[in-house]
Amino acid sequence: MNRPALPRRLLLAAALAATTLSATLAPLPALAKDITLLNVSYDPTREFYADVNKAFAAQWKARTGDTVTIRQSHGGSGKQARSVIDGLEADVVTLALAYDIDELSDKARLIPADWQKRLKHNSSPYTSTIVFLVRKGNPKGIQDWDDLVKPGIGVITPNPKTSGGARWNYLAAWGWAQKKYGSQAQAQQYVARLLANVPVLDSGARGATTTFVERGVGDVLLAWENEALLALKELGPDKFDIVAPSVSILAEPPVTVVDKVVDKRGTRAVAQAYLDFLYSPTGQDLAGQNYYRPIDASAAAKYARQFPKVELFTIDQAFGGWAKAQKTHFADGGTFDQIYTRK
């Protein structure tokens, strides 16, 4: 027996309803998100991270469709670490030295104690060293560390209590003196004479550069290599010269995600990708362009000619690591306090 045919109008309505239901149940494309990260960094990385942030944001947008904005905070490395410990919600920190990041674990449990093992090269995607920036023509004839303690030489360096760069400066000088004179006591005497030639201690490396370059104070600036090369680029080689000392320290600025912050904010994936980007070919190229020494062999070879030849020693070789160096030299009552309170 044949069933009566349904009216055409009802068939169309049923078809429309089925289509609507199917569309309702179909998965919707993910909506693009706007993400903000805070990178708390040390003083002279401003130009570098401006380039990194632009390149990473473009890559992340192409890969995920999400818009990521990276905000920057810059200052003396020790001061920056204390700000994070006191509650500044950094998704990542890119500081001047490992001890300052260790403090985030030791004092606030913001990161695990083994944070430095999570990325290659002890979580340092680039390196640097300490050189001398002098006025054009080097009128005071400064060639090596022993020239810095001569009478009448004005030496500009920041305060090691607040600046990571200043601690690298201090240890570079100490390491040279210890090698030359053979004892800790003589090294301390040398550093005391050097500090006696320092007219002012700025809180960070960029402030010290401003004092030397813009205010015209002093005869020589103890500087991050990248900061000295940037000064030549921006201000012109007709105003300053770089002097590479015979021996200096290998500065290894490390990076990490701040676990408690990224887990609270839900930003771990993008924060980790941001740090991984520093190790990528593009990130390494940007490091070289901004006068940091890349750790990737091909990038290091590409930019090798822009860096002076310097014999380098490491913090582990000369001082037994950052924890020991900090306690001996920069903690309350350490050698810096012993020297500077007598100044």
Where are these regions (language model features)?
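A bilobed periplasmic-binding-protein/Venus flytrap-type ligand-binding module shared by bacterial periplasmic
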Residues: 129-138, 252-269, 286-290
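Twin-arginine (Tat) signal peptide motif
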Residues: 2-14, 25
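Short helix-loop capping/hinge motifs at secondary-structure junctions, enriched
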Residues: 137-143, 162, 175-183, 261-269
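Short beta-strand->loop
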Residues: 40-42, 134-136, 154-180, 195-198, ...
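N-terminal segment of the mature folded domain
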Residues: 32-162, 337-342
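Extracellular/periplasmic juxtamembrane helices and adjacent flexible linkers that interface
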Residues: 262-343
